[in-house]
Amino acid sequence: MACCQTSFCGFPSCSTSGTCGSSCCQPSCCETSSCQPRCCETSCCQPSCCQTSFCGFPSFSTGGTCDSSCCQPSCCETSCCQPSCYQTSSCGTGCGIGGGIGYGQEGSSGAVSTRIRWCRPDCRVEGTCLPPCCVVSCTPPSCCQLHHAEASCCRPSYCGQSCCRPVCCCYCSEPTC
């Protein structure tokens, strides 16, 4: 069975068997609303996942319970998603020193720029190698990037690694922050 055509499974890629390329999924991984047991290696996909498949945004689960926006056990515990988008550790590297948490804290320390972590849904973060639930940057992402990559434009097929369509965050209306 062929890989998914334009979807994104795992971060940055997923291949455990079958015919998979750098930006496609394990066979059948994208065909239902549940992850396959080995879709993205053990750190990414669990045998089943929540229908909306968000990890760390706005909530998550490591105990097996799911609500509308959480993941299955261990999905948020390793490299896929950090334990929480609002924790200061394990969120990749950025520019400068220091850190800010939340939806857009800015700061600086003299001439040294401050690293900011911007939380967003767990869609693909283009141009980075960071876990999708965090963006570390010296400049704030747009409100569109932060708040409008939602289930309506993500394929909810991957536990902790929901897949954005390529134009997911490109055509939404920019809200006023």
UniProtKB/Swiss-Prot annotation:
Keywords, ordered alphabetically: Keratin, Repeat
InterPro entries: KAP
GO cellular component, one term: keratin filament
Tissue occurrence: Expressed in the middle/upper portions of the hair cortex, in the region termed the keratogenous zone.
Superkingdom field: Eukaryota
Subunit structure: Interacts with hair keratins.
Name used for this protein in its record: Keratin-associated protein 1-1
Record flagged with keyword Repeat: yes
Family: Belongs to the KRTAP type 1 family.
Gene name tied to this protein: KRTAP1-1
Role this protein plays: In the hair cortex, hair keratin intermediate filaments are embedded in an interfilamentous matrix, consisting of hair keratin-associated proteins (KRTAP), which are essential for the formation of a rigid and resistant hair shaft through their extensive disulfide bond cross-linking with abundant cysteine residues of hair keratins. The matrix proteins include the high-sulfur and high-glycine-tyrosine keratins.
A Pfam family of this chain: Keratin_B2
Record carries keyword Repeat: yes
